[in-house]
Structure formats: structure tokens, C-alpha cells
Amino acid sequence: MAGKEYVCVMKLHSQVPIDRLKKVLQEFQGTIYQRPPVRSSVKRRLRTRTIYYLNFIEMNERNVLFKVGCEAGTYIRKLCYDIGEVLGCGAHMQELRRTRVGPFIEDESLVTLHDISYLFNQWQLTKDESILRKFVYPMEKALQLMPKIYIRDSAVDALCHGAHLTAPGVLSLDSGIKIGDTVAVFTQKGEAVTLAKAFVSSEKMLKMDHGFVAKTQRVLMPRGMYPKMWRSKQ
């Protein structure tokens, strides 16, 4: 799952020195433990989440503005509560704005519904696809931060029919893939084929000449885009 970035206003329940506040914010960078809030859509089990950065921006009386980059599934309102507990004054989330999800950044990716309506009408009149590309991105953009495996053309159609990826079909791959990681499988041209779960690490995958290396979880490419190079069992 893609990491996220937020800008948050945290309300302190009493005043604290700014130096003390900055020090505590730095303590929350890295791996933290979180139990989801009472009002949440998941079971309230203690779990770990990664805070990639937590940057202080400004403080106005008891209102603290900060930017946080975090692993998906991190509850910012719980983060504010925990910061307040460590400070000893208590705190809660006052305002929250998400500014990034994976490769999609607020300043670069957002369009209004009015923009979409206008551009769609323009496309209907002109049939100029470049107009749509102003707000419709190829799905590969959403996958660009995921670990990737590139495959031979001969393996593409089999995967499009739900087959698992075997070692002979692999051309190249990103380093650092671990067992159980979700990976994006691409053609040599950079077209997304499937999302898959790695059976082995990238180091072992490079040494294999046969056997399954990744389990297909979601097919992204329609069947028949590449020639069929496999045979069905009779």
C-alpha cells in the first residue's frame, strides 16, 4: 500500500514550550505502535506503523501545524492523542488535509469536478485524447512506487488468464523484494500486467531457472493483448 502525507493542525490542551514540542515530535519518527481509535473501521489490535517524517511547521498559541509522511493505515488523530500523552498536556486533531498518496501529489494531481466536466465535454466535441490525459492518468502511474518484475512477452498472456509467474518468464526485477511482498508485474514496454505476491526474495528469484516465483492476485491487462504462447492441458 502506498505511503501518505498529511498536513495537520493539532490542538494542545495546555501550553508547552516549543523546544519540548519539537523534541517529542522527533521521537515519533520511525516505527511506532498504534491501537486504532474506538471509532474506526478495523479491529482495535495493537500494530506497528512507520512514520517516515514528522516536520514541525509552526505554532500559534496551542495550535500546532505539522507535516507527516506515514505508512498507509496510520491514524493521525491517534498520533495526535499519543503526542499529547507524551507531552503530558493532552492533544487532539483539529484539522487534517491529505497532500499525497503514493506518487499523487496534491499540487500536481488534483482537478475539480468542474474541470472534469469541462474537459470531458471538450473531448466529446473534438475526440482529442490529449484533452483527457490532462486529468486521466495511465494506471501505471499509480504503480510506479511498487517493486517491479519485468517479464518476457511469451509469459504475458498466461498471466492475463490468471496463471502464476514462473522463473523462466522473468527478465529483470527490482532489488529488495521479500517473500510475501506485493509486486507489480510489467511487460518489457512498461505495461502493467498483474499484481502478484512474491513467493521468494529477489536474490533467490535471480538464481532460479524453474518454479513459481510470484502468485497472481489481480490481473490488470485484458486477455489477448499479447499472443498466446502456452498450451492448455488436454
Where are these predicted regions, by residue range?
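Acidic, low-complexity central loop/insert segments
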Residues: M1-G30, R39
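Short flexible coil/turn linkers enriched for glycine and charged/polar residues
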Residues: A2-G3, R47-T48, M59-R62
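Nucleotide/phosphate-binding catalytic cleft detector across ATP-hydrolyzing
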Residues: G30-Q34, R47
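A short secondary-structure junction signal
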Residues: D19-K22, P36, R77-D82
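Ser/Thr-glycine-rich phosphate-binding loops at phosphate-binding pockets of nucleotides
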Residues: G69-K78
